[in-house]
């Protein structure tokens, strides 16, 4: 009598062969019969994948190379699956990967495209902004939206003392030379790639309605880049990196103007060599010069005193201040409460405490 039990899940009249059922999975798992090696296209595709993954991230264009190699690898896989394997699923999946990597590759190449800077602004970018690692596309945004290039002929005035407002613009000289004077007395020159009105911009950031305390005249046919001050300020608030760049450049420009005041014979080549971090004392000295000339009753004597050099003011005994360094009621000097605390004179109580054992 046959004692083999028929499973309820087994179709009627069909008895499973247990020997064959256990032997087939064993043969497939053991891989006793290896299939032949795939076509060369398959291996080249995998080589592209491997090469893309081992590209070092320190390489400047590593993402472009990675996406490019992945795109080539996916294309080779599609060729292999279509011509040599006839596998529809492999072809579909690699087609999806190909589209994704190709789009990313095009996007990366587009971002790396060379930014065309106007010829008139190329020297400005290379001298002032490129050394500070400002990207060309950011510089293009800075100079392409709310600024324009203006010209002045020889003898024309950029600003007149007590007449021109300082609230309207901020400019950088691109070509030519300008002369800064106070009541007919020459102070210093302004050369290309230098701010024209940086002291006024720095001192009146918190105060509006001020007027220029000096006269700025074109000593040659000049061309300058002019920003709308209000729109520039708003733009810098949205770009913290550029905001810090402008703070540095304006401070450095004020320092260069201070050196020009101390040495009126300083030319453009010598001014290029001045590359120091601007200090508070330097900025205060420039502003005190312009403020004091506008406030002193004997302004002619004060001007001559200042033009002889700032060494006379530094030789004053502690506790005495020069009458020519009084601040103006019109042009308010820079207020830096933190730095002012450093230069406070020690009080008598502090000296007594220091003498105690």
Swiss-Prot record:
UniProt-annotated stretches for the region Disordered: 309-357
Question: Which coarse location class applies to the principal site listed for this UniProt protein?
Answer: membrane
Q: What are the TM regions of this chain, as residue ranges?
A: 39-59, 63-83, 90-110
Q: Could you list this entry's UniProt keywords, alphabetically sorted.
A: cAMP, cAMP-binding, Cell adhesion, Cell junction, Cell membrane, Developmental protein, Glycoprotein, Membrane, Nucleotide-binding, Tight junction, Transmembrane, Transmembrane helix
Q: In which tissues is it expressed?
A: Expressed in the heart and skeletal muscle (at protein level). Isoform 1 and isoform 4: expressed in heart, muscle, brain, stomach, kidney, lung and spleen.
Domain of life of the organism encoding this protein: Eukaryota
Where's it found, cell-wise? Lateral cell membrane; Cell junction, Tight junction; Membrane; Cell membrane, Sarcolemma
Stretches in topological domain Extracellular: 1-38, 84-89
This entry carries the following GO cellular component terms, namely: bicellular tight junction; caveola; cell periphery; cytoplasm; endoplasmic reticulum membrane; lateral plasma membrane; membrane; perinuclear region of cytoplasm
List the Pfam families.
Answer: POPDC1-3
- Name of the molecule in the record: Popeye domain-containing protein 1
| Gene Ontology MF, one | structural molecule activity
